Design a protein with these regions (language model features):
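Surface-exposed, interaction-prone regions used to assemble/regulate multi-protein complexes
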Residues: 1-131
Length: 131
């Protein structure tokens, strides 16, 4: 798994279950993660048909480039939060320097025949450090 250091700057995402009163976030299907050095990571989760042919499945994905979000994104900004980015062909993880996972993306949930890919965002962590 490839690993490199970055400084997290801003996360924009579409969230469902957003509580405007206490500014907390719950579920995301897509996100745009921006780093201080200008790198941009776009995350998404999509439904499809299982390769097994039995029902639907989900796939998580990520692309390293700038891409707009559809809809009205919610933005969480950080004062240059240092993070570790770990990536291989099927999984991406963004962790703080204490190894707490902030964002995880799995392309297929480690199951080829019944994929259950996902985007996991540690909203408690983001709410704590949000501007």
């Amino acid at each position: 798994m490839e690993q490199f250091m970055q400084c997290l700057k801003k996360i924009s995402f579409l969230a469902y279950g957003y509580e405007a009163d206490d500014e907390s976030f719950e579920i995301a299907d897509s996100a745009k993660v921006e780093f201080v050095n200008g790198l941009v990571l776009f995350l998404s989760k999509n439904k499809s048909i299982c390769p097994s042919g039995h029902g639907t499945c989900t796939y998580g994905s990520w692309i390293w480039k700038d891409k707009p979000l559809n809809g009205n994104p919610i933005v969480a900004e950080f004062p240059s939060l240092p993070v570790k980015v770990e990536e291989d062909g099927r999984y991406l993880s963004i962790k703080d320097l204490n190894n707490r996972e902030i964002i995880a993306v799995s392309k297929d949930g480690a199951d080829y025949y019944y994929p259950d890919g996902y985007i996991e965002v540690n909203f408690d962590y983001l709410n704590k450090y949000q501007k």
